[in-house]
Amino acid sequence: MITRHAQRWWSVFKHWGNNSSTFTIDPARTGLLGLMSLFLIWLVLTKSLPYVLAPTAPELALWLAPDHPVALEVQANKARARLLELITAETVKESTTKSDESRGAEPAIGFAAPNLVTDKQSRAIERKELREKIRVLATKILVNDPLNAHAFRLLAEVEEDPDRIRSLMREAVKRSRRESVAVFWLLNDNFHRKEYKKTLDLADILLRTRPALHKYVMSYLGQIAEDTQGRALLVKRLAAQPSWRSLFFSALPRHVRLANTPLELMIALKAAGHPPSPAEQKPYLTFLLSKKLVDPAYNAWLQLLPEEELTTLGPIYNPSFESTPSGLPFDWAIGRLVNASVEFAPREDVQNGHALHISFGSGRVTFPALRQVLMLSPGRYRLTVDYRGRIIAKRGLRWRLSCLQNQHNTIAETDMLMGMQAHWRTITFDFEIPYIPQCRAQFLQLLHDARSASEQFISGEVWFDELNLNRLGD
């Protein structure tokens, strides 16, 4: 078998050898093939290979293609990095010198002074040379690649005339919205010139293309929100529901000087027909409460409520568990659960009625709390709640009321709820809100009163409905 295959291949090669003269009898075709091969090699060396070499060996790439834009850009970026290094070192040295002078340190004297001057002059010369090198390289890039946004930005960075810088930065952004340095420079420039519409346009670009820069962009948007003219433009932009709207409201409280600025912005959005969602309100209300600004937080929440809810508002919000909780401080909020579920479920015995339904799985349960912040004035009150269910546990559930700013100060609590309760019954407990600043607001919560891990085992289900809070006569 092997012998037959070998003989077959030998006959093929022998036939080719006998007919190889066909390549020599037509020198024109042979020459044409040679020229085509050389042309292809030239294309590879001057077009394809420089792209491969440019990131790691720009000098070799430029030797093959002297005007290759990618290699020129790599060299320009290296020069820029060196220039930034020199500028940073100079800034640090100047700040150190000023710090020494402020502490009363003696200036350098004697033979060291000429060396310092010479070193400073040499760094200044190097910076000047680097700027010129970047300018030349960027110009060459644009000759070969007029749409290169990065080259326009490099040119802008080595210019000194503000109008020229502004023009070049605009050209960079016009060619690519992902040229973030140019976008941010223009954002800052337009902000300081009070061109708020252009500032918002550029902020929109950055927040869409570079969300990681939101901390820096939000500082500008926060200041625009505090300007009457800027706020109107910002409201219009937010009403269009940009993708970064929730991020904006989450960061806004940390980027304003006046505590009422977010509220004024939200009220304006509400008036424009695009009110903030509960998720957008929550960071602001939580921020106010963390600063112990309880009354401003409650006032803000009231102003952002729909008109129809204000007319039926009582001391407890949503006392019959009819609407889905928003998670806001003055509404029901549910903590993270493990092996338990909480829902506002329909009641089978009441048409269109709902109740709080809690079910526990078998095993250890994490049931942090169902909670709501109340604003009760000092005095005596009575709280009632309907309850039924079956709970098997060492320690059961409690309703507890405490002072918001000192939650260890328990005002009142129910007995532990556990065992079997097949039919609805009403729980009642009286309490008194003290005249102390820490109790300006109160914290009502339903919790599993477990004191240790071994007491976290609970099973069963429970229903609650119709919380009623009434003030008693003094």
Task: Report residues per predicted region.
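Extracellular and organelle-lumenal recognition/adhesion modules and their flexible linkers in secreted
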Residues: 11-18, 23-62, 66, 73, ...
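Alpha-helical repeat scaffolds
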Residues: 58-62, 92-100, 128-140, 164-173, ...
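Short extracytoplasmic
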Residues: 60-92
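Alpha-solenoid helical repeat scaffolds
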Residues: 73-74, 150-154, 180-188, 201, ...
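Residue-level signature for tetratricopeptide repeat
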Residues: 78, 124, 158, 188-189, ...
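Structural motif corresponding to the intra-repeat A-B loop/turn of tetratricopeptide repeats
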Residues: 82, 128, 159-162, 193, ...
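Alpha-helical adaptor scaffolds
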Residues: 119-127, 138-142, 149-160, 219-225
